[in-house]
């Protein structure tokens, strides 16, 4: 059962919430800067060569490490979502209100966009790589993104949002980073392995290329929502209950 709660203006504009939005902006900026930056660096080192297995591994590791750090530095303030699909999945499971979630989205999208604009500036206008399906149809790309984002948000629930997580919560950031790195290795050559609408939106804005960008909204949001339904309803149950900031917003 969906446990969506709209929330109140007062709660969404409280000092604690404002700090959470700023934390999401900064953490998403740092994550996307490192993630997209690793792809740009690969192109620089290979003179624009095609992605090879070693490059895929390097980019996957860069994303995993950057997300581990991003989640860690924001966890005690905002919960460390860094991803509209994670925020949506947690909203479906009743762990963040819709109104607050919308502002999380704004912060995440702005952070990703600023990161890519900064990369364009500091690399003297190097092309910002955007996500695009390769060798498969866009519909197949959506399914790919649904599956890998489900895995990501399910991991978030199991290690961070579940009130029964106990000491497992201490490894949440690294577990989340690991699943993202693994999913990039699996999906990178096909859908790009986004799992994150903000991670795809920022480069699209900086490059002015939104071709196929809808894939990276539909797939991750469906996958994140399904994970919220499954874990939130089957394994947690109950009604709406805001999770404390220090646990996972």
Swiss-Prot record:
Give the molecular function GO annotations.
water channel activity
**Gene encoding the protein:** TIP2-1
Signal peptide start-end: none
- Extract the InterPro entries matched here: Aquaporin-like, Aquaporin_transptr, MIP, MIP_CS
Task: Identify its protein family.
Answer: Belongs to the MIP/aquaporin (TC 1.A.8) family. TIP (TC 1.A.8.10) subfamily.
Compartmental location: Vacuole membrane
Membrane topology reported for the UniProt record: Multi-pass membrane protein
Q: What positions does the record give for the motif labelled NPA 1? A: 83-85
Question: Position of motif NPA 2?
Answer: 196-198
Its lineage reads: Eukaryota, Viridiplantae, Streptophyta, Embryophyta, Tracheophyta
Task: Output the GO biological process annotations, alphabetical, semicolon-separated.
Answer: water transport
Q: Which domain of life is it from?
A: Eukaryota
Sorted UniProt keywords: Membrane, Repeat, Transmembrane, Transmembrane helix, Transport, Vacuole
CC annotations in GO:
membrane; plant-type vacuole membrane; protein storage vacuole membrane
According to UniProt, the name of this protein is Aquaporin TIP2-1
What does the function comment of this entry state? Answer: Aquaporins facilitate the transport of water and small neutral solutes across cell membranes.
Query: What's written under domain?
Result: Aquaporins contain two tandem repeats each containing three membrane-spanning domains and a pore-forming loop with the signature motif Asn-Pro-Ala (NPA).
- UniProt keyword Membrane, yes or no: yes
Transmembrane stretches in the record are 20-40, 54-74, 102-122, 141-161, 168-188, 217-237
The reply to whether Membrane figures as a keyword in the UniProt entry is yes
């Amino acid at each position: 059962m969906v446990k969506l709660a709209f929330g109140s203006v007062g709660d969404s504009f409280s000092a604690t919430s404002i700090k959470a939005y700023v934390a999401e902006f900064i953490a998403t900026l740092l994550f996307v800067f490192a993630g997209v930056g690793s792809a740009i660096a690969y192109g620089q080192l290979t003179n624009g060569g095609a992605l090879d297995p070693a490059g895929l591994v390097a980019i996957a590791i860069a994303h995993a490490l950057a997300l581990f750090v991003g989640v860690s530095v924001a966890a005690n303030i905002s919960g460390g979502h860094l991803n509209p699909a994670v925020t949506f999945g947690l909203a479906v499971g009743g762990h963040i209100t819709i109104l607050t979630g919308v502002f999380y989205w704004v912060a995440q999208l702005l952070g990703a966009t600023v990161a890519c604009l900064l990369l364009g500036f500091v690399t003297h206008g190097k092309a910002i790589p955007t996500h695009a399906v390769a060798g498969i149809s866009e519909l197949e790309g959506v399914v790919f993104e649904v599956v890998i984002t489900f895995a990501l948000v399910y991991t978030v629930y199991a290690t961070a949002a579940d009130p029964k997580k106990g000491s497992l919560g201490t490894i949440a950031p690294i577990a989340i980073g690991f699943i993202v790195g693994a999913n990039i290795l699996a999906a990178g050559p096909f859908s790009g392995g986004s799992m994150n609408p903000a991670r795809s939106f920022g480069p699209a804005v900086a490059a002015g290329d939104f071709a196929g960008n809808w894939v990276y909204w539909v797939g991750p949001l469906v996958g994140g929502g399904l994970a919220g339904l499954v874990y939130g309803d089957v394994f947690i149950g109950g009604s709406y209950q805001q999770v404390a900031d220090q646990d996972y917003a």
